[in-house]
Structure formats: C-alpha cells, structure tokens
Curated annotation (Swiss-Prot):
Keyword field contains Membrane: yes
The protein, known as: Protein crumbs homolog 2
Segments on the Extracellular side according to the record's topology features: 36-1221
Record's keyword terms, sorted: Calcium, Cell membrane, Developmental protein, Disulfide bond, EGF-like domain, Gastrulation, Glycoprotein, Membrane, Repeat, Signal, Transmembrane, Transmembrane helix
Domain Laminin G-like: 444-607, 649-808, 872-1051
Cellular component GO terms, alphabetical: apical part of cell; apical plasma membrane; apicolateral plasma membrane; cell junction; cytoplasm; subapical complex
Predominant cellular place of this UniProt entry's protein: membrane
Organism (species): Mus musculus
C-alpha cells in the first residue's frame, strides 16, 4: 500500500456542500429576520395627537385628519386621583365625575380621610392613620383591632409546679402549691432549714415536706423522736422471749433451740438414735401434731418441742426400736393357715384353696378358664363347678352329650341330655300344663265360681306350694293348705297376690307383692314355702327385677305335722272356692304333682273360655268388666241397665213459664250425706234442692249469679267455683260430713216449693233440667218407670211432683222471631242463633256489615270492627317520614299488640310512642343489629334475639302474662312460636295510647321495607284510606294524625333487577331489596362475573379435563377408555370391523380385541396419531408444541392463534395519541434525517474517492497556486497512491 499524503481540495468541488448547508441555515433563520430589515411604513397623520382634549383624531383618505368628540369626554386627562373611577357627565365633552375608593374624598379624590379622627383606639392606644384604614398601637396588657381585648397573661401558663395563675392588667400573679415559692413558683422551699430531725437524724428535703433518716440513731418516728423498741419487731424465732435494751436485744430460747435469735432448731435425730431402720421424728416439727395423720398427741407447744420419737418398722418396738416383736402372736394367718415368726415379719402357710400374705384370698380356680365349650365357671373352695351348655357335660364341659341322639320327646317337650357317673342319658322337659316321661299327661283344669276342688298330700317337715294360674277376677282364694292347727292361704286381694299363714285361725304372718295386678287373664307362676322358720313368697313376672319378685318374713315356730283332717301324716289342699273362677296347672305340694284326676269336686279339664267382653257389649262408653265366664257393665251416669242402654229420664222444670217442683219424704240417712245430680240451665238463679222440716230449711242448694251455693243452719255458705248456667249438662256432687249436718228434716224439695213465694229468697223456682238425682247413691226418680223397684229403700219414701215435663225439653225461643233484617232463627236448647243476610251480622242480625260493600280500594282489604270497618293493607316505606296514628277515641282495653314487617335494615324503627310520664308509659320496637329489640311499658326484650333483617316476613305478637294485674310481664311470640319469650321486668298496660290524652304512635321511622297488619288490641291501624265518599261508622278506632303523610300501599322492594346487575346473560331474581343471579353454565359468582372452571371438581375419572367455551367440560380419554368421563373401558373390536388399524398397519386379532402393528412414526390404539408429533415442528410463528394424550397442542405466542398458530390476530387497538399531531412532525423529522444522511453519504464518498485509487493531477492542479509560488515556497515531495 502506498502512503497517503495530505488531502488536496479543489476550489470548485467543495462549494456544493457549503451552499447546501447555507440554504438549510437560511430556511431555519427566516422566521427570526429582524423587523428593522423590513422597510418601515409611512407614519399616520394622527400620530402626533393634534386634536384637543376630549376629542379624538380620525385620518381621512386625502391624507388629512378630522377631530371628533371622544367617548371619554373630560376623563381623557385622567383627572381622578388615588385609583378613583372617572365617569363622563352630560353633553359637555369636558365634564366628568370622580367616584372615590374608600379612604379618599374631594372632587378629584385628592383628600385622604383621617380614620383616627373618631379615636377608635381604646385603653390609651395610639392611632396611626393609613390609606383606607387605621392601626392601633396598644399599651401593655391590651390587644385587638381597637385595643378592646385585655391580654390574658396566664394563657402561657407561666406558673410552674402546679401553681395557680391570677391574671391582672398587663401582669399576673402566681399562687404557688405548697412547697414552692418565687414569682413563677420556680423555687423549691427547703423544709430542712429548720433542722426538724432529732437525735442526729439526717434530714432529706422533699416537695412540701421532708424525711428524716433515723438509721443508726436508736430512734424512729417522723422526726426520730421515739426510741426504737428492738423487741417490737419480734426478732426472736420459735416463740422465744425477747429482752429489750438500748439499740440491742437478747432472746431467751426454749429447750431444743439455739442461736442469737433462737433461729436454730437443734437436730436431735442427727446422732441416729433409732435402730433397725426406725424413723426418727423430732418433736419440734409442728406438722406432726393434730390432723388425721398426727404422730404426737395434742397441739404443738414449744415447751415440749425438745426431743425425738422413733417410729419403728413392723417387727420392732421400744424407745429406740431395739426390741424384736413376735408377729405371730396376733394370729395373722386366716382360713386355717399356720404362722412362722420371722425377723421383722412372719410367714403364713395356707390351706388348699387360699393364698395371699395372710391367706386372706380365696384362690379363683376359674382364672384359668377350665370350663370348655362356653361353659360358665363358678369358683368354690379349692375347686370349681362348670355350668355347661346343653350339648356338653362333665366336670369341665369336655364331654359331648349324646343322650338325646336317637330319642325324641313328643309334642312341645324338649329333650335334655344328661351325663351322670360316666353314663349318657336324657329326660323330656315338658311345657307348662303337661307331665310324664313323654309329657303325655295334662295338668291343666278349670274351677268355676262358687265351687272348689280338694285333695290330700303327705305331710313334711318343710312346706312348699307351687302352681300356675290365670283369672280375670280382682279377688278370690287361689289355694289353701292346712291341717288341724295351721293353714297356709294364697289369695288375690284387689288383683294383688297375698300369702297368709294362720295358727288356730289367727293370722301369724301376711306377705304381699304390691303393684303387680295379676287379673290380666295370662298365666302366672307362684310359689310359697315355709322352711326353717321363714315364710317366702315368689312370683315370676316380667314386671319384677330379673323377672322374679320375692317377699319373705320370719315365723316364730313353723307348722308341724299333727292330727290332720284326713288320714294321719297328710295335708288337705283346697283350690278355688268362693267367687274365684279361673284355671290352674302344675300344682305341686313339696314337689308332689297333683294331677286333675287325683282331685275331688267339680274338676273341668283344660282351660277353654270365650272372651265375654269381645266385642264390647256396653253402650254409651260403659266399662266392661271381665268376670271370666260372663261380664258386667259399669255404666256412666245417667245410663244404666245390663248393657248401659237405658237412660234415667230427665225432668224439665218451669217449661212455658210454669212453676214446677218435686218432693220426697226422708228417714234416717246416716251421719254423712252425698247429693249428686245432672244440671242444665241458662238461668243464673233458682232453687235446686232444699232439706226442710215443715217450714224451716236446714240445708238449701241454689243458683245465684250462675254459681251453685249451699247454705245450712249455723254454717258458712259453700260456693262451687265456675259458672253453671251455660246451657250444657253438668254433674253436680256435694258431700257433707257429720260436723256440717244437723237434723236435715223430713222432706226434700226439688226445683221449688208448692208455694212459689217461699222460694224468692233463693232466686225463685228453678227453670231447666234435672236428671239422675241421687242421695247416698240412692236414685230418686221423678217419674214412675218399669225399671224402678216396686219397693222404696228404708231411707226414702215417694213424694209428689207438680208441672214436671219428662225429658229435657227446650223452650220455643224463636217465637216470636228475635232475628232482625230478614235473619232466620234456629232453636237451640233454651236459646237460639240467627243466620243473617250478607250485609248484617251480630247475635240478632242487628249490626250492619260494611265489607260486602267493598269500601276499601285494592290493594287494601276491609276488616270489620264494631259498628264499622278499617282498611288494612301492606305498605312500603323508603326512609321517609313516619306514619302517625292516635287512639284518642278508643276507650276499650288494649290487650296486646300485633305487627307484621319485612326489611333488610340492620337499624330501623318499627313502632314508637314516648310520653313524659315515664318508662311505663312508653313503647318502642325496632331492629337493632339485625335483631328485634324494644321496650313495652317497662318490659324489655331480651337481647340478642333471632335475626329479622333478612327480607322475609316476620310477625310479632305481644301480650301481658296477667292482663288484669297492675304490673305484669309481657310475653313475645315471634313468627307463631308455640312457646313465648318472657320480657325482662314488670310492665304496665297500653292505656297511654288511648283516650283524650293518647300519646301519638309513630310507625316506620328511618325504616326501609314493608309493614303488614298492625293492631293494638282489637283495633287494626288504618294504613289505607277508605273509598272516596265512604265513611266508617266505628265508634272506637285509631285514626291517622292530621298532616301525617300518606303511605305507599303494597309491598314492593327496590328495583334491584332493573337494569339487571347480572353479567354474561345471568337471570336476576328479586329477593326484596336484594338480588340473586342464576348464572349460565360458563359463569359463576354473585353477579356471574367469574368464568366457571368446569374442571375444578375433577370430573374425569381418567385422562385430562378441558374446559369448553360453553362452560362445560370435555374429558380427553387415554387409550383404552371412553365415555363422557373416561370411565368405561373400550370394548374389544375385531379386525373385520371398519374401525381397525389406520394407514395400512397389519391387524392381529386376539381374545382381548385387536392389536395394530403401527409403522414407524405412528402410534395409538389404531395407529391414528403420530409417535412423536412435535418433532415435525407443526407450530408456526414461534408457537410451542407439547404432547397430551398422544395429540400435539400448540401454545401460540402473542398475536397469533389457531391450531398451528397460523392465524394473525387483528384486534383493533385504540391509539394512545393524536395521529396527525404526531405523524406530521415525525415525517418532517424523518425527511430532515434523510437529507442529513444523504449529505453524509456524499461526503463519505468524496472522502473515499480522495483517499483511494491511482492519483492523476489534473490540469488545474498543475497550474495551480502552489506551482505558481514555486519560486517562493519549498514544495514538499509529491506522494501518490499506487
């Protein structure tokens, strides 16, 4: 390479880029060309302002000017000073007026007003006049615009240490707290200056005080003035005595204690005085005295605290445990064991069957479980007994019983195998009522009422009777076993079993098994035994503990065999007898079975009978009593007869206004009297019964104000509670004892007396019905009847009657017709009822009905009240003003309150009425924290209650527990609860809501929701007005307060679904001021705002779950499985089907289906997929390939989509900037850059051209300036690039 010499520029080649740069520079500097370079315009003729003041110059086209009047007039010269406003005045062009700013005056506002002339500064302040205002310079102690305010020098709290500041004029004074002084209480007073501490005590100054340090002085007290008593602090331990000295003390110790303060407890046990392992106990230990485990007797005392005691182990004794004790001396070995004495102990040698330290334990041979095959082991002394199951026997149940093999028992008998003395056998266990080797003999027989059977049995030293029986009778003799001296009787008394042992006819012992009725007709097993002076009664019954009841008692001497009623050495037994009727079986005396053929008397084999009370034979609810072979009906009054079909006839007194009466003659009735009868009447007064002797009444029973009263001579009246004049039948029963009765007299009057005036004292003659009159259970008939006996009992005698009507007959109460306004009358007993037409109601159809006329407009409904109506409706409230009602015209009692509401407000008022009379005249109900709260006349609802702010309807009912009481608890029923909730505290009534001074009742304060029916007592609140032109005639009702706003009728929640808040097509459901969205399958969330993940619950049993756009899922199954959830295995298919191997792969059939041999690069059950699909890079535009279940998937990069990422996304995006405002400058910048780049390229090309290639100087260069100056300059050698 040749050397490069200096660049040589030609005069014409370098001018072009310079010209181009100059051009660009001129274009850039053109907007900033100075205005001076532009030729000036010709000056106007008006520039010199040639016109007079008040006129303005106007140039003309000819180059001259004219002076015209100016709109500024005289203001053109700015005559007004100090910022005043100048306004021209009138036609005179030189006139003007100045409007001064505040603080100046004069024609030209040239005068400054002196604001200090009025002396505004107070308290000697100096006034400084300023423009438009003044300024006060205040003296010390004052401040403010006019020095009007006195400065509070105490505001800066100058007084320290809690001092009090007293403000003055321009000053302050501090009142210091005790212990401080100074102008600002900054000085702490030194109380030690007076040297208050005596006896050399050191004084320490405190705030408002001092403290004396009396250490090492021998003195104490606040000023060290008292001598210290060293013994006062009880320095001596262990109850030692203290001797006081000056600044010293001395302790006198008890024996066993030492030390300066007697604090050392001398250890007497340190020398180990107790031998043979004895425990040494010091007497100075207080824990060893008193208590349950005390070692030393009595209470602890320091006077006896010296010394020790040895607690010796077993086998040793003495003060130091040096003596060996003979443990066998006390005979410790039990149950025949022999004792051997040992050092510090003994050894017992036990008899067989016992063990333990003292042979106290009976060895349980059953612990080894010797009984086989489920046998039960019972321990005995030195042995055991096995209770074997039925199939096994032997000592340890090891022998299988075979006695029943090849043998059968007839009927219902059970074969029981046996094993005795090594031999197998069997016996038949017979069911009850049978006997014999093969249970072929019947032991059951019957005994009828009024007869008995008997037999003889051998006598024995002991006595036992066992039998089974059944009966339905309450009482009767079951069995009697006796000899000439003694008898044992088994009876039923009130259906209860009882055993009686008698001697010489006198009962010696009676045993009873109470509370078990045995007359139920079932079989019962009973046993009674007399053995070793004890009588025992047993009963097998399911009502007994363990199904066995036992009663027993001692007998002085048991019965002995003596000369019996039969042959010598026998007992007589009697079964049945008297009223007993029933059956017996398995009767045994001392184990001897009595068969029916061995008995004498009327013996009926078997136990056959028909249920006499089936079907029920007793009418009118009569009780059927089973008497074994027949029945008896216990009839309710007033029925009687064998089957209760006959009714005792009633007697009607006073029918049609007649005067009725009946009488009976009496004889001796005994000391007691019971009167009973049926009564039916609607009259509140009248004579019922009167016992009299001639004209003197001894006992009178009568009606007074609907109550039954009984009055006798010398006794206070008796009143039966309740009312008896309601027209219903009542059974009346009166009982009198001997102390309540005197001579009743000879006659009984019923319903009246034969002279009506004689009954006025007791309400007059009776009107009504009397039936089944009985005296001491003796029936007194009002009418003769074939049912009555022909002869009267000795206590009574037939009397006479007047104007009685048989049967209980009613008056014709519908004649004349009592029903008004077309009502139909219907007769009831001595009363009537009316069926009214549509527009009338009431007992006699006299009250008008308003609601059929539809006086209320929908949605309100009409509700009838006395003499009128009320329009009730549901109403909607939206935080508006409350609805106000008043009950000033209500006089009836308000028994309670009902209220229905629904809301979602957690804080809202429901109802309120507050008076100045106190808590018992207030009521409020509200929703607090979502629960019901309130105060009802002083009773407070318990909190918290159930949540009610849930948008559902809730119904509240409040009532007093005792309505008539002055103060009572209030009870709350919420939403129809069966059990009320009691409010806390006693409350008054709701009387403050009614009458002339009624307290206004406010509904729905700050309430959003609906109110339903609201009622106080029987008066609903009229939330809706009646139809126009309709007026309710109700005398008592609540009315809306004048000016109370009208309510919005109907219950409507807010428009929560309009517009619908549910996204993505969800359906909005209105839940009353709340909503719920029913989302489609692809969405979820409160507003369907969350895309649902159908794969969240892993629905696919196998394979992978993929979410579909419609919100459902799709399971992509692995090979070999199919179905919506990949649950089902793919069924085998043959090679001859269409769905076999793909791409010509050979197919091989087998028992499990087809098997395809896939070509290279293919895979799958049918060779339907690529073996390694991602190796071919199927994903375009930078997508990522992955394999799932043998199929490839492409995960595309941003901006692409599709199966192979081949689709370019063309979603338009909004421009974040204005296009034109950015594009034009950008284009200009690009153009400029292009020009600069072009220029740079040209220069670079020129440079390359100059520095590369072969250099040939041109003609101009040869004749250039450098050659022309050869004679002057030394030209360097030329260099050229070769």
């Amino acid at each position: 390479m040749a050397l490069v010499g200096p660049r040589i520029w030609g005069p014409r080649r370098d001018i072009y880029p310079l010209l181009l740069l100059l051009l660009l520079l001129l274009l850039l500097l053109l907007p900033w060309v100075p205005a001076g370079l532009v030729p000036p315009e010709t000056p106007s003729v008006c520039a010199s302002d040639p016109c007079a003041p008040g006129t303005k110059c106007q140039a003309t086209e000819s180059g001259g000017y004219t002076c015209e009047p100016s709109e500024l007039g005289g203001c053109a010269t700015q005559p007004c000073h100090h910022g005043a406003l100048c306004v021209p005045q009138g036609p005179d062009p030189n006139s003007f007026r100045c409007y001064c700013v505040p603080g100046f005056q004069g024609p030209h506002c040239e005068l400054d007003i002196d604001e200090c002339a009025s002396r505004p500064c107070q308290h000697g302040g100096t006034c400084q006049n300023l423009a438009d205002h003044y300024e006060c310079h205040c003296p010390l102690g004052y401040a403010g615009v006019t020095c009007e305010a006195e400065v509070d020098e105490c505001s800066s709290a100058p007084c320290l240490h809690g001092g009090s500041c007293l403000d003055g004029v321009g000053s302050y004074r501090c009142v210091c707290a005790p212990g401080y002084a100074g102008a600002n209480c900054q000085l702490d007073v030194d109380e030690c200056q007076s040297q208050p501490c005596a006896h050399g005590g050191v004084c320490h100054d405190l705030v408002n005080g001092f403290r004396c340090d009396c250490a090492d002085t021998g003195y104490e007290g606040a000023r060290c003035e008292q001598e210290v008593l060293e013994c006062a602090s009880a320095p001596c331990a262990h109850n030692a005595s203290c001797l006081d000295g000056f600044r010293s003390f001395r302790c006198l110790c008890w024996p066993g204690f030492s030390g300066e303060r007697c604090e050392v407890d001398e250890d007497e046990c340190a020398s180990g005085p107790c031998q043979n392992g004895g425990q040494c106990l010091q007497r100075s230990d207080p824990t060893l005295y008193g208590g349950v485990q005390a070692i030393f007797p009595g209470a602890f005392s320091f006077s006896h605290a010296a010394g020790f005691l040895c607690s010796c182990p077993l086998g040793f004794a003495g003060n130091d445990c040096s003596m060996d004790v003979d443990e066998c001396a006390s005979g410790p070995c039990l149950n025949g064991g022999s004792c051997q004495d040992l050092p510090n102990g003994f050894q017992c040698y036990c008899q067989d069957g016992y063990t333990g330290l003292t042979c106290q334990e009976d060895m349980d041979e059953c612990q080894s479980e010797p009984c086989l095959h489920g046998g039960t082991c019972s321990d005995t002394v030195a042995g055991y007994i096995c209770q074997c199951p039925e199939a096994w026997g032997g000592h340890d149940c090891s022998v299988q019983l075979t006695g029943c093999q090849g043998h059968t028992c007839p009927l219902a008998a059970t074969c029981i195998p046996t094993f005795k003395s090594g031999l197998h056998g069997y016996f038949c266990r017979c069911p009850p009522g049978t006997y014999g080797p093969f249970c072929g003999q019947n032991t059951t027989f019957s005994v009828v009422s009024g007869s008995s059977v008997w037999g003889l049995v051998p006598a024995a030293a002991s006595l036992g009777l066992a039998l089974r029986f059944r009966t339905t009778l309450l009482a009767g003799t079951l069995a009697t076993l006796k000899d000439t001296r003694d008898s044992l009787e088994l009876v039923l008394v009130g259906a209860v079993l009882q055993a009686t042992l008698s001697r010489h006819g006198t009962a010696v012992l009676i045993l009873t098994l109470p509370d078990l009725a045995l007359n139920d007709g079932h079989w019962h097993q009973v046993e009674v035994t007399l053995h070793l002076g004890t009588l025992e009664l047993r009963l097998w019954h399911e009502g007994c503990p363990g199904q066995l009841c036992v009663a027993s008692g001692p007998v002085a001497t048991g019965p002995t065999a003596s000369v019996a009623s039969g042959p010598p050495g026998s007992y007589s037994i009697y079964l049945g007898g008297g009223v007993f009727a029933g059956c017996f079986q398995d009767v045994r005396v001392e184990g001897h079975l009595l068969l029916p053929e061995e008995l004498k008397g009327t013996v009926l084999l078997g136990c056959e009978r028909r249920e006499p009370c089936q079907p029920l034979p007793c009418a009118h609810g009569g009780a059927c009593v089973d008497l074994w072979t027949h029945f008896r009906c216990d009839c309710p009054r007033p029925y009687r007869g064998a089957t209760c079909t006959d009714e005792v006839p009633a007697a009607t007194f006073g029918l049609g206004g007649a005067t009725s009466s009946a009488s009976f003659l009496l004889h001796q009735l005994g000391p007691n009297l019971t009167v009973s009868f049926f009564l039916r009447t609607r009259e509140p007064a009248g004579l019922l019964l009167q016992f009299a002797n001639d004209s003197v009444a001894s006992l009178t029973v009568f009606l007074s104000e609907g109550q039954i009263r009984a009055e006798g001579l010398g006794h206070p009246a008796v009143v039966l509670p309740g009312r008896w004049d309601d027209g219903l039948p009542h059974l009346v029963m009166l009982s009198f004892g001997p102390d309540q009765l005197q001579d009743l007299g000879q006659r009984l009057y019923v319903g009246g007396r034969f002279y009506p005036d004689d009954t006025q004292l007791w309400g007059g003659p009776f009107r009504g019905c009397l039936q089944d009159l009985q005296l001491n259970s003796i029936h007194l008939p009002f009418f003769s009847s074939p049912m009555e006996n022909s002869s009267w009992p000795s206590e009574l005698e037939a009397g006479q009657s007047s104007n009685l009507t048989q049967g209980c007959v009613s008056e014709d109460t519908c004649n004349p017709n009592p029903c008004f306004n077309g009502g139909t009358c219907h007769v009831t007993w001595n009363d009537f009822y009316c069926t009214c037409s549509e527009n009338f109601t009431g007992p006699t159809c006299a009250q008008q009905r308003w609601c059929p006329r539809q006086p209320c407009l929908p949605p309100a409904t009409c509700e009838e009240v006395p003499d009128g109506f009320v329009c009730v409706a549901e109403a909607t409230f939206r935080e508006g003003p409350p609805a106000v009602f008043t009950g000033h015209n209500v006089s009836s009692s308000l028994s309670g309150l009902t209220l229905a509401f629904r809301t979602r407000d957690s804080e809202a008022g429901l109802l309120r009425a507050v008076s100045a009379a106190g808590a018992h005249s207030n009521i409020w109900l509200a929703v607090r924290n979502g629960s019901l709260a309130g105060d009802v006349a002083g009773s407070v609802l318990p909190a918290p209650g159930p949540r009610v702010a849930d948008g559902a309807w809730h119904r509240v009912r409040l009532a007093r527990e005792f309505p008539q009481a002055a103060a009572s608890r209030w009870l709350l029923w919420l939403d129809g609860a069966a059990t009320p909730v009691a409010l806390h505290g006693l409350g008054g009534d709701l009387g403050f809501l009614q009458g002339p001074g009624a307290v206004p009742l406010l509904l729905a304060e700050n309430f959003t929701g609906c109110l339903g029916r609201v009622a106080l007592g029987d008066f609903p609140l009229p939330l809706a007005p009646p139809r126009s032109g309709t007026v309710s005639g109700a005398r008592e009702h609540f009315v809306a307060w004048p000016g109370s706003p009208a309510v919005s009728l109907g219950c409507r929640g807010g428009p929560v679904c309009s517009p619908s808040p549910c996204l993505h097509g969800g359906a909005c459901r209105d839940l009353f001021d709340a909503f719920a969205c029913s989302c489609g399958p692809a969405w979820e969330g409160p507003r369907c705002e969350i895309r649902a993940d159908p794969c969240r619950s892993t629905p696919c049993v196998r394979g992978q779950c993929h979410a579909r756009p419609d919100g459902r899922f799709e399971c992509r199954c692995p090979p070999g499985f199919s179905g919506p959830r990949c649950r089902l295995p793919v069924l085998p298919q043959g090679c001859n089907l269409n769905s076999t191997c793909k791409d010509g792969a050979p197919c091989e059939g087998g028992p499990l289906g087809t098997n395809c041999s896939c070509q290279e690069g293919l895979a799958g059950l049918r060779c339907q997929s690529l073996d390694k699909p991602c190796e071919a890079s199927p994903c375009l535009n930078g997508g990522t390939c992955r394999v799932a279940s043998g199929i490839f998937e492409c995960t595309c990069s941003a901006g692409f989509s599709g199966q192979f990422c081949e689709v370019v996304k063309t979603l338009p995006l909004p421009l974040p900037f204005p296009l034109l405002e950015v594009a034009v400058p950008a284009a200009c910048a690009c153009l400029l850059l292009l020009l600069l780049g072009l220029l740079s390229g040209i220069l670079a090309a020129r440079k390359r051209r100059q520095s590369e290639g072969t250099y040939s100087p041109s003609q101009q260069e040869v004749a250039g300036a450098r050659l022309e100056m050869d004679s002057v300059l030394k030209v360097p050698p030329e260099e050229r690039l070769i």
